[in-house]
Amino acid sequence: MSGNTFGKLFTVTTFGESHGLALGCIVDGCPPGLPLTEEDLQVDLDRRKPGTSRHTTQRREPDQVRILSGVFEGKTTGTPIGLLIENTDQKSKDYSNIKDQFRPAHADYAYWHKYGVRDYRGGGRSSARETAMRVAAGAIAKKFLQTVYGVRIRGYLSQLGPIKVEKVDWSIVNDNPFFCPDADKIPEMEKYMDALRKEGDSIGAKITVVAEGVPPGLGEPIFDRLDADLAHALMSINAVKGVEIGAGFDVVEQKGTEHRDEMTPEGFLSNNAGGVLGGISSGQDVIAHMALKPTSSLRLPGKSIDVNGDPVEVITTGRHDPCVGIRATPIAEAMMAMVLMDHLLRHRGQNADVKVDTPDIAAIARVKAQD
């Protein structure tokens, strides 16, 4: 398996399986001198961890992270940062009945054909449990971006099944189990998920993530465009089946006069581009959306085959999220942070001395908005 490392200058390599002893990662490329503690990482890990509400998996993992290296006297040293989270609530026997069976729409079948062996306990390496380490690594990137450059990254659940958010109040996002920014929609989501759980079924979701204060100039055309790398990062998250930048697929119905983000000395008049022009950040908010499929691990019987190709009826009895999107917001934030951190370091290495006389109109607009 050769695809376990993300990034070029700010790199994150994760390891571990859902029911293994522990999960871990190595973060390399973080500049020295950044104040960093385990508590800094734990905030986002607690937002992501399982068992925090009746609407998520009841597997209860504390997800306590340990910093093994790369930090001395409370500051990063510039050397690789080693992180570890122990697994404490595995119930591998729950998966014994599917040892030789493939769950429909799960990674089981593809992993078997690629590797000839698979860890059937909770999906092994293909489990979304792996994302705990992404969140821990992303928290480092988020702190650097916020501390050094004033970049703020935050996200929210913008759609759960048929329920679409209609307004965004950032102040309530972390005060409900859905990361929902629309207070009027939370009771509706609660009712919907309670009914879904009784049915034994699952549902998909959509997450929106926004980076504010991103300087213009991040992104490396042609093949490492900022939006291309964002799409790559978000698509690498378990269950993600689609990514949009800015207006996304709505551009199909927009006319050019509507889509173009016109400019004035006071700022941009719209942000259909999602903060990226020509693969390079424009200084506007970077906005991305991702769609997550419903989990395929269900207690409802489904048709499949076993390792011999014979027909079987599959029932999954382990503990699973009825909607994986509910806990995906911190993961999306982490991946966006890692992309922006990597591109900022690349930009700083090659283009730090580039100066132009044209004002940063997005920054001007932000200042005026604060007045």
Curated annotation (Swiss-Prot):
Subunit field text: Homotetramer.
Function per UniProt: This reaction introduces a second double bond into the aromatic ring system.
Pathway: Metabolic intermediate biosynthesis; chorismate biosynthesis; chorismate from D-erythrose 4-phosphate and phosphoenolpyruvate: step 7/7
UniProt entry keywords in alphabetical sequence: Amino-acid biosynthesis, Aromatic amino acid biosynthesis, FAD, Flavoprotein, FMN, Lyase, NADP
PROSITE patterns reported for this sequence: CHORISMATE_SYNTHASE_1, CHORISMATE_SYNTHASE_2, CHORISMATE_SYNTHASE_3
Binding site for NADP(+): R48, R54
GO molecular function, one term: chorismate synthase activity
Superkingdom: Bacteria
Identification of the protein by name: Chorismate synthase
Entry EC number(s): 4.2.3.5
SUPFAM superfamilies recorded: Chorismate synthase, AroC
GO CC terms: cytosol
UniProt keyword NADP present: yes
Cofactor(s) for this UniProt protein: FMNH2
Co-factor: note: Reduced FMN (FMNH(2)).
Biological processes annotated in GO: amino acid biosynthetic process; aromatic amino acid family biosynthetic process; chorismate biosynthetic process
Reaction catalysed by this enzyme: 5-O-(1-carboxyvinyl)-3-phosphoshikimate = chorismate + phosphate
Lyase recorded as keyword: yes
Annotated binding of FMN, by residue: R125, S126, S127, N238, A239, G278, K293, P294, T295, S296, S297, R319
Pfam families in the cross-refs: Chorismate_synt (PF01264)
Similarity-based family: Belongs to the chorismate synthase family.
